[in-house]
């Protein structure tokens, strides 16, 4: 089964982008390269069980086992030593990436309270978009009753676009609900 977003990209989005930006080669047309989900768990310093719960939630959200991130430097004020586990991240590519993007746009973002669209100022200047999610409860896989702590996560959408304008157009074509 081919993902509906993959079909939409090849049949509608790529030709529309080529027409709008007038690329010399079809290989120049921007596409989504990967999506990185990152969950920083600062309270894992005092209680390692919190990190295990975050890893479990990230596994449910992404459908893939996360990589546990470690502290690069020791910071005495935070009681943090180099090499301590302080977060988890997942890199999604291919079908899983498109499945997650579809779920994010059509299911999860509409579940955010008082949702009026996502900020269009979160592009990094190189065609990548970063979205901060305040609570993991917006994802349908997370059972509200089993969550003992509300955690946020970062979603970074990495594209092959050279400019923010191209990346914004690409994500808008995919259906990202940018605030007006």
Curated annotation (Swiss-Prot):
Entry keywords, A to Z: Ribonucleoprotein, Ribosomal protein, RNA-binding, rRNA-binding, tRNA-binding
The organism of origin for this protein: Lactobacillus gasseri (strain ATCC 33323 / DSM 20243 / BCRC 14619 / CIP 102991 / JCM 1131 / KCTC 3163 / NCIMB 11718 / NCTC 13722 / AM63)
NCBIfam families, sorted: PRK00010.1 (NF000585)
InterPro entries in alphabetical order: Ribosomal_uL5, Ribosomal_uL5_bac-type, Ribosomal_uL5_C, Ribosomal_uL5_CS, Ribosomal_uL5_dom_sf, Ribosomal_uL5_N
One cellular component term from this protein's GO annotations in UniProt: ribosome
Protein name, as recorded: Large ribosomal subunit protein uL5
Listed GO MF terms: rRNA binding; structural constituent of ribosome; tRNA binding
PANTHER family associated with the record: 60S RIBOSOMAL PROTEIN L11-RELATED
Top-rank lineage group of the source organism: Bacteria
Assembly and binders: Part of the 50S ribosomal subunit; part of the 5S rRNA/L5/L18/L25 subcomplex. Contacts the 5S rRNA and the P site tRNA. Forms a bridge to the 30S subunit in the 70S ribosome.
Keyword presence, Ribosomal protein: yes
Function: This is one of the proteins that bind and probably mediate the attachment of the 5S RNA into the large ribosomal subunit, where it forms part of the central protuberance. In the 70S ribosome it contacts protein S13 of the 30S subunit (bridge B1b), connecting the 2 subunits; this bridge is implicated in subunit movement. Contacts the P site tRNA; the 5S rRNA and some of its associated proteins might help stabilize positioning of ribosome-bound tRNAs.
GO terms classed as biological process: translation
UniProt similarity note: Belongs to the universal ribosomal protein uL5 family.
């Amino acid at each position: 089964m081919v993902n509906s977003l993959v079909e939409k990209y090849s049949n509608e989005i790529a030709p529309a982008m080529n027409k709008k930006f007038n690329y010399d080669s079809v290989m120049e047309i921007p596409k989504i390269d990967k999506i990185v989900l990152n969950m920083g768990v600062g309270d894992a310093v005092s209680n390692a069980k919190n990190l295990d719960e975050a890893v479990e939630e990230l596994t449910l959200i992404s459908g893939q086992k996360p990589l546990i991130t470690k502290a690069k430097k020791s910071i005495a004020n935070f009681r943090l030593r180099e090499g301590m586990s302080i977060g988890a991240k997942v890199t999604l590519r291919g079908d899983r990436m498109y499945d997650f993007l579809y779920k994010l746009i059509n299911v999860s973002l509409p579940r955010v309270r008082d949702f009026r669209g996502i900020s269009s100022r979160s592009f990094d200047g190189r065609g990548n978009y970063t979205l901060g999610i305040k609570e993991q409860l917006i994802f349908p896989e997370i059972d509200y009753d089993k969550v003992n702590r509300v955690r946020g996560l970062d979603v970074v959408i990495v594209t092959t676009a050279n400019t923010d304008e191209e990346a914004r157009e690409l994500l808008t074509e995919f259906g990202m609900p940018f605030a007006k």
